[in-house]
Amino acid sequence: MAGRRSRNNDITVDILLRAYSAGLFPMADSADDPELFWVEPEIRGIIPLDDFHVSKSLAKAMRKKPFAIRFNTAFEDVMAGCAAEAADRPSTWINATIRRLYTELHQIGHAHSVEAWEGDELVGGLYGVSLGAAFFGESMFSRRTNASKICLVHLVERLNAKGFVLLDTQFTTEHLKTFGAIDVPKLDYARMLDLAVNRPSLQF
């Protein structure tokens, strides 16, 4: 199924949740692409929730409390921030269909945002999908130094407090590896995923 393309009206939130439970997730080639395709990596990125790393410099920055951190108060704005072009991200895989589908997931309690606020301004955030005891990180953005990093720290704290057992990052990057992200072969990931998604759904 990896790489199979679907027209906009082919995918519902029910199909999307079933895909996540099977280890697949959708992407678009660009924001203007009318189609989605399913991705099933041979090597999957995860952050072990019991081995999350916070650098000394980030911990020092967090002690200054530069942002107010909120959850699920501006989900669509976080998606818009993640979809916006930036100097380090000239294009995006988040198209209108993805924004609609994940907003619907948010409305039924399966997609969530972590937000960094500076006064009344949203300056960073991330969003992802919860299913069972798994959380699938989708994208993040930052308009201030460390904003998305601090959101990630708060996400992990919340997942641990709520009893989640899997934080899926889809792929690893050098940035995520500084937090402890590792690569997991598909078969190993499938076992971890099965254990996580077949638990009763946890409240985020």
Swiss-Prot record:
Disulfide bonds: none
GO cellular component, one term: cytoplasm
Origin superkingdom: Bacteria
Principal EC category: transferase
Enzyme nomenclature, EC number: 2.3.2.6
Compartment(s) where it occurs, according to its Swiss-Prot or TrEMBL record: Cytoplasm
GO molecular function, one term: leucyl-tRNA--protein transferase activity
Keywords: Acyltransferase, Cytoplasm, Transferase
Function, as annotated: Functions in the N-end rule pathway of protein degradation where it conjugates Leu, Phe and, less efficiently, Met from aminoacyl-tRNAs to the N-termini of proteins containing an N-terminal arginine or lysine.
Family per record: Belongs to the L/F-transferase family.
Protein name as catalogued: Leucyl/phenylalanyl-tRNA--protein transferase
Taxonomic source organism: Agrobacterium fabrum (strain C58 / ATCC 33970)
Gene name of this polypeptide: aat
